[in-house]
From Swiss-Prot:
Keywords for the protein's UniProt record, in alphabetical order: Acetylation, ATP-binding, Cell cycle, Cell division, Kinase, Mitosis, Nucleotide-binding, Phosphoprotein, Serine/threonine-protein kinase, Transferase
One Pfam entry name: Pkinase
Subunit (UniProt): Forms a stable but non-covalent complex with the CKS1 protein and with a cyclin.
Keyword Metal-binding applies: no
General function of this protein: Cyclin-dependent kinase that acts as a master regulator of the mitotic and meiotic cell cycles. Required to drive the G1-S transition. More than 200 substrates have been identified. Substrate specificity is in part regulated by the bound cyclin protein. Phosphorylates YTA7 during S-phase to promote transcription of histones. May phosphorylate CNN1, to contribute to the enrichment of CNN1 on anaphase kinetochores.
Name listed for the protein in its UniProt record: Cyclin-dependent kinase 1
Keyword Acetylation: yes
Origin: domain of life: Eukaryota
EC class (word): transferase
Family note: Belongs to the protein kinase superfamily. CMGC Ser/Thr protein kinase family. CDC2/CDKX subfamily.
Amino acid sequence: MSGELANYKRLEKVGEGTYGVVYKALDLRPGQGQRVVALKKIRLESEDEGVPSTAIREISLLKELKDDNIVRLYDIVHSDAHKLYLVFEFLDLDLKRYMEGIPKDQPLGADIVKKFMMQLCKGIAYCHSHRILHRDLKPQNLLINKDGNLKLGDFGLARAFGVPLRAYTHEIVTLWYRAPEVLLGGKQYSTGVDTWSIGCIFAEMCNRKPIFSGDSEIDQIFKIFRVLGTPNEAIWPDIVYLPDFKPSFPQWRRKDLSQVVPSLDPRGIDLLDKLLAYDPINRISARRAAIHPYFQES
């Protein structure tokens, strides 16, 4: 089921992800033409217990995901009881770095935003159709290839390994793209957690800065409330069942999204509004988002 570490020649360390170090490597297996791959070393919380078999099963499912908008997982290397390496298609640019490379006073451009959004919605829709959630979507794990197309990375890893509070580097894992049902302590969540994140990324591509940039869970919740208004049972009936919801939360009024994201046309605002619906039941699906009028030629 898993390959051998000797099949890969490490070239250099290229980064540190949520779960461990990422290396640029050569795939030495016959017939692969020495292609360049990303070798992700997974550091597991409980070093003493080894790699859980559930994680291996989950990750094996990810090898079946084959879509233009998803970073391919080529191989799984379980070198010993404690170490796991995932071998992915290599892409050296992510959306965060891509945006940082464009001067802050310049827009990304409406056409680029629309193209990336379409690729993001299609990639998520594909994964959701295979019953796989991402749960940790953010610009850092949206990768851009040399043709300028966007692909989703780190899909399904959250279910296999959990979403840690801190990355193994002790850097706090960002809350900026996290759905309100998760922030409010909900344990039963579904595909809506990813479509919320798409909405946050959409607004960020337009505004060139995060729409909700909290530095703690409560700050994140209040940042959302300040823009979208404090939710109540009328607009989100199940909110009262979320463990961390308090009727005593400060009451903010909703802002007009067209003033929050002024560069977006009315169709774009409508899509953003549907992605950032409070009640996950009312949140647009990725499949429906991909056929929203925003994407039609205007």
